[in-house]
Amino acid sequence: VSLRSAQGIYSFIDKERYNLYIVEMQGNRWEVVLPSGEKTPIDRNDFSFTENGEKKNFDFAYITIHGTPGENGLLQGYFDLIGIPYSSCNVLVSAMTFNKFTCNQYLKGFGIRVSESMILRKGFEILDEEVINKVGLPCFIKPNAGGSSFGVTKVKTKEQIQPAIEKAFGESDEVMIEAFMQGTEITCGCYKTKDKEVVFPITEVVTSNEFFDY
């Protein structure tokens, strides 16, 4: 998913104005893809690399990583430390919005209505009846901190609750159990620069599956 996002953005940026490089990050493997297709390591001290014997530094990072470390503030904090500007929101906003339960509690403080939910941490158990009494069925059981729709299950029956919890724990140390909300799903993208704020048209999310996923 992350690589597809990167390739999409790469295809739209003007190559006459910018020297573009895709950097692949997987665990401790950080590599930049050179025009030849060869991959060379990134120096994590300053996010630089060497090409044809010449050291090259980045002027800007366009973050397209779905999940950690691209959406939870870790990569943003790293770029802040070494002084490289980047796309996406800052450390605080990234960390808070990546944690679904924390984000919902924050929104509640502003009087925004959110689905009823509960948090379950690894090592603790919960009875099926507790889930049903708290959020009802159907409900969504999902990793509390996770990208895209990995580990997410729409639970319709009591028998599906524990397998869904186990699946979600495979992606995160915390699981969020959330009441199902019937309605029209919409999304609205926006971005802010030094000079302006741009809000894109509201878009309805339509899927042939049980819920929008990858």
Please report, for each region that a protein language model flagged, where it lies by residue.
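Glycine-rich phosphate-binding loop of ATP-grasp-fold ATP-dependent ligases
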Residues: 2, 115-119, 138-166, 185-187
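Phosphate-binding site of ATP-dependent enzymes
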Residues: 156-214
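Short, hinge-like loop/turn segments at secondary-structure boundaries
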Residues: 37-40, 105-108, 133-135, 158, ...
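Anion (oxyanion) recognition and catalysis
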Residues: 14, 80, 108, 133, ...
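ATP-binding N-terminal substructure of ATP-dependent carboxylate-amine bond-forming enzymes
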Residues: 1-92, 96-98, 102, 121-130
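Short, glycine-/small-residue-rich phosphate/pyrophosphate-handling segment
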Residues: 98-118
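ATP-grasp fold ATP-binding core
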Residues: 107-108, 132-150, 173-182
